[in-house]
Amino acid sequence: MLKSTTRHVHIFAADIRNDNFIASDTKLTLDVDPDNEFIWNDPALQKVYSEFDRLVAAYTGLALTEYNLRRIGSDLENFIRGLLQQGEIAYNLDSRVLNFSMGRPQVRGPGQIENRPGQ
């Protein structure tokens, strides 16, 4: 089964049936932020899904290869970084992983985080 995994984006050339991955040449499955490193809201998550759909459509007609999946995953990772920098999502300080892989957050006060772009 072809797949691409980045820190916050897992893409599988597969369908999910009964909690199992079934390899597919025609379906991609997306798992966003599997470690719950971010605090998500529905609008931000829908933006990621829409961007994923747009990227997949841009590759229509091209071979389904690991390289192309990695390109889509990298583009989505950058898209998520943009959401973080714009303040549409925030780091989850209760996450089991406090990696701050997309830049250090700035703490403004008790329980409030401000993301610092490029840090």
From Swiss-Prot:
Domain of life: Bacteria
Keyword line: Cell inner membrane, Cell membrane, Membrane, NAD, NADP, Plastoquinone, Quinone, Translocase, Transport
Documented EC number(s): 7.1.1.-
Top-level EC class: translocase
Keyword Manganese: no
Record membrane topology: Peripheral membrane protein
Any GO CC annotation of this UniProt entry: plasma membrane
Quaternary structure annotation from Swiss-Prot or TrEMBL: NDH-1 can be composed of about 15 different subunits; different subcomplexes with different compositions have been identified which probably have different functions.
Protein name in the entry: NAD(P)H-quinone oxidoreductase subunit M
Organism: Gloeobacter violaceus (strain ATCC 29082 / PCC 7421)
